[in-house]
């Protein structure tokens, strides 16, 4: 990390600097390290366009197996998210859902979607954690790892058998998947190598052992996301931030063709049956397409119901948000990997107004920064500090 900004920070000339993953192990335990949560959820996106997959197959190559949900689920379960975060990020934490702890459904009262029971229950169901095996829902939720390599192998075998029966793959075909990105950098290479190793390990002991080929293509530049949506390659890493105070609206990123990475998945044809008021009497079980549920949740023009914020109780909306999150996750086109945290070193010259990050106020802003040294005193000592301590 020998760049100009890093050298300037070490000399005491700038107040803070981000910690690069290449030096994270040396500095993450520093007394001057600051870790800040973010609403960004980083995911691995798996190609949904089976026709595009087939069109890009070479001789004795298969890509269409990615169209089988068992195979995509296997990929999800083959990802050790804790290891991914330690290898490919500086300070991010394993992520399992479309939302993290920075998504508020009730801003006035500090209500965080991910902290609600319905949101925890959904992730337990998606990742096969039986709540009855634990003392509480919270204990079951805390036990989620998203990593089950043995079940992943079983699912690979199942998907292979089905693909072979369907005439999609032959015994001499290799599964060839391309991880695409915008540029060839140390960071993108690190991510690619992690995914490659995970997929190769996933097929050991299955009919695809020795037949998994994972390639790297950094030629997509600024159009990498749209190229992926158009079916130009097989795997990318990307995600979404924004609408942190409206998780119901945020679902648009995963359900609307205008935004979703999995554009070949028709959410107007995928249905969800659900009773939105549970034991209530106003609604029986309703069955609508996913995008229709979304439109009702957000009070869209022409929607069958108006369940927008302020029109119904929060608990009513939370149940729908949770069901839509579950529906997206169970397709395994978007595989959450991490909840983004940034890591910075703060100069010994300054102190923030608060050491606890607040999504509305940050660390207090410039107004509340205090100084341990004036400029003259700082000049005398600024190069004497050890930022590893």
PLM regions: where:
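Solvent-exposed, polar/charged alpha-helical surfaces in well-ordered, non-transmembrane soluble domains
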Residues: 3-7, 11, 25, 69, ...
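Extracytoplasmic/secreted cell-surface and envelope-processing proteins
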Residues: 5-7, 25-29, 44, 54-57, ...
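Ligand/substrate-recognition segments at binding pockets and active sites
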Residues: 1-3, 8, 126-242, 342
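Second-shell loop/turn segments in exported
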Residues: 5, 56-66, 71-74, 137-145, ...
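Extracellular/periplasmic solute-recognition and catalytic clefts
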Residues: 1-56, 82, 86-87, 93
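A bilobed periplasmic-binding-protein/Venus flytrap-type ligand-binding module shared by bacterial periplasmic
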Residues: 39-71, 87, 338-341, 349
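Loop/turn elements at helix/coil->beta-strand transitions in domains of secreted/extracellular proteins
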Residues: 12-15, 70-73, 80-82, 173-176, ...
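Detector for C-terminal structural segments
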Residues: 76-125, 183-197, 228-389
